[in-house]
Amino acid sequence: MKPVIALVGRPNVGKSTLFNRMTRSRDALVADLPGLTRDRHYGEGRIGDRPFIAIDTGGFEPVVKEGIVAEMAKQTRQAVVEADVVIFIVDGRLGLAPQDRAIADYLRKTGRRVMLAVNKAEGMKYTSVAADFYELGMGDPYAISAAHGDGVRELVDEALELAVQERPELAEEDADSGKGVKIAIVGRPNVGKSTLVNTLIGEERVIAFDMPGTTRDAIYVEFERGGKPYTLIDTAGLRRRGKVFEAIEKFSVVKTLQSIADANVVILLLDAQQDISDQDAHIAGFIVESGRALVVGVNKWDGLDGHTRDRIKHDLERKLQFLSFANFHFVSARERTGIGALMRSVDDAYAAAMVKLPTPQLTRVLQEAVEFQQPKRAGVSRPKLRYAHQGGSNPPIIVIHGNALSSVSETYRRYLENRYRAAFKLKGTPLRIEFRTNKNPYADSKD
């Protein structure tokens, strides 16, 4: 599980700047969901080998009772509930403001671990920066500059330590949570996730457990299908009632991110009776960004006429082009149709994500691809692609060595990706291609 850090403060104290600084390794913004654009943004970051989730909130004015500011305050309160640690940001240049006192009063009542960060402190002495803010009763302030990065790593390091103190299970490895292929079923509310869970587990013996803590902790459901062990990771807020799991359908970005990170394969479930939404596309973006193997299930397919089915397939091709590496299955979780093929694709996607690719074959495919179509020249030189080897798995990473590779176009990179996918039958997994330019040993020599 990844620690969750919420950034809270009044307007214009630098929360978004700090958010972007913290999440730079993952291109900052991971989620910007409809209805949340003025309040909560979610991103993934990493300090060394420790990943975390950051939540950027809108300007917080807890005493306002109506209007858009009140709605922003509501969303900020939700971020605090989701967080393991709250970083309360104030403005060192402007000093202590009445809104800061109101926010501090609110945060004290929540019982959350809170760190006080005095932003915009570059060029200022710590004693003068911190003096105003001790009266908030939030402990020793951390002087930082989100814009320049000063003090940010130390701040996040301490936040992660506090998170582990709050929830010791955060320090544990996720690898032991569940047997077999770990599957996360994700999607917006009411697409049929709980029905699919019940269909998959059938009458098999189920071991379900709640990890200690709050609603943002996961449920793992172990089951067998065709003699193979699997573990389902809940993202829908499933709770067991008798032998049936029912969904408390409230979409949680944090739970979705956590479950995707913990999974081997993700099933993205869509509703055939509703148009593809921005939220569907955002969830798909989470999965691609994470590098997880993917199978797409289009649920509630039963009862649709041929014209409607053709229209839906056209919309899927148009709106989810970036998921072309995945298998799409048209299923009915309620009627239990198409589930066998869906699970076969889960197995295939897992195998593709974990595949071992020998260097000689990788290099041969590269040479054949270049022979068929060379990369375009960039100025006076043409990129020279020499050899390839595997740089990692889950997702597979292919590292290509050569000269002048910085000028290889995105179009040519996609061409190579397609050649490798076809050669090794890599269906269902993202594929990363990295270019490494060899140093020219004669670059510094003179004629």
UniProtKB/Swiss-Prot annotation:
KH-like domain residues: 355-439
Residues reported to bind GTP 2: 187-194, 234-238, 299-302
UniProtKB keywords: GTP-binding, Nucleotide-binding, Repeat, Ribosome biogenesis
Gene Ontology BP annotations: ribosome biogenesis
Domain EngA-type G: 3-167, 181-354
Top-level taxon in the UniProt lineage: Bacteria
One function term, GO molecular function aspect: ribosome binding
InterPro entries recorded: AAA+_ATPase (IPR003593), G_ENGA (IPR031166), GTP-bd (IPR006073), GTPase_Der (IPR016484), KH_dom-like (IPR032859), KH_dom-like_a/b (IPR015946), P-loop_NTPase (IPR027417), Small_GTP-bd (IPR005225)
Entry's family note: Belongs to the TRAFAC class TrmE-Era-EngA-EngB-Septin-like GTPase superfamily. EngA (Der) GTPase family.
HAMAP family per UniProt: GTPase_Der
Function: GTPase that plays an essential role in the late steps of ribosome biogenesis.
Quaternary organization: Associates with the 50S ribosomal subunit.
Protein name listed in UniProt: GTPase Der
Organism: Cupriavidus pinatubonensis (strain JMP 134 / LMG 1197) (Cupriavidus necator (strain JMP 134))
